[in-house]
Amino acid sequence: MANSSPVYDWFQERLEIQDIADDIGSKYVPPHVNIFYCLGGITLVCFLIQFATGFAMTFYYKPTVAEAYKSVEYLMTDVSFGWLIRSVHRWSASMMVLMLILHVFRVYLTGGFKRPRELTWVTGVTMAVITVSFGVTGYSLPWDQVGYWAVKIVSGVPAAIPVVGDFMVELLRGGESVGQATLTRFYSLHTFVMPWLLAVFMLMHFLMIRKQGISGPL
């Protein structure tokens, strides 16, 4: 590379970063690809916004039944731009779900789930389930009337499953009733377990797309 900087030369000598850049930049893009093939990328951008704004809110949120609502209220009224951070988090959550739905429809209608891309489809559907679960767990965190009763209803749904239903309800709630243990579990799922799960499946999803390329036209 002509007129390269010493910093570039240092990294190039050790990591051969130019080869990596050439490989990324030279990936073939089929001529049939249009704006609707960007829906998956937009979903990723929404997730990154969710991660950044969610991380910012953890500095102020208190996951206890006594202080959760007050901490959210404090974030919205007293923290500089706290209202904006939480609002962006909510808006990007809605946008992420919408883009995900449109992305799934695009892939299905263009046959992107067919052989040899079955595993790519499976990882995508798994991410869709995790994304919906994000919404369910996040909805409860303010611990207001809406959040409380939403958790009570959602966590009671598995009771209809034969044999293991009652066990699953107690596992979700952390006991026989909805309370502090429930909020702690939902907070842990929303801020730690699900982000890591989604990140792992995203990596698998992108690596398979990178390996197999974009599916052809119908």
Curated annotation (Swiss-Prot):
Cofactor note: Binds 2 heme b groups non-covalently with two histidine residues as axial ligands.
Listed SUPFAM superfamilies: Transmembrane di-heme cytochromes (SSF81342)
Subunit structure of this chain's protein: The 4 large subunits of the cytochrome b6-f complex are cytochrome b6, subunit IV (17 kDa polypeptide, PetD), cytochrome f and the Rieske protein, while the 4 small subunits are PetG, PetL, PetM and PetN. The complex functions as a dimer.
Source lineage: Bacteria, Bacillati, Cyanobacteriota, Cyanophyceae, Synechococcales
UniProtKB keywords: Electron transport, Heme, Iron, Membrane, Metal-binding, Photosynthesis, Thylakoid, Transmembrane, Transmembrane helix, Transport
Additional detail: Heme 1 (or BH or b566) is high-potential and absorbs at about 566 nm, and heme 2 (or BL or b562) is low-potential and absorbs at about 562 nm.
GO cellular component, one term: plasma membrane-derived thylakoid membrane
Species annotation: Synechococcus sp. (strain CC9605)
Protein family (similarity comment): Belongs to the cytochrome b family. PetB subfamily.
Protein name, as recorded: Cytochrome b6
Binding site for heme b 1: 103, 205
Protein role: Component of the cytochrome b6-f complex, which mediates electron transfer between photosystem II (PSII) and photosystem I (PSI), cyclic electron flow around PSI, and state transitions.
Protein's GO biological process: photosynthesis; respiratory electron transport chain
Positions bound to heme b 2: 89, 190
Cofactor dependence: heme b; heme c
A Gene Ontology molecular function term of the record: oxidoreductase activity
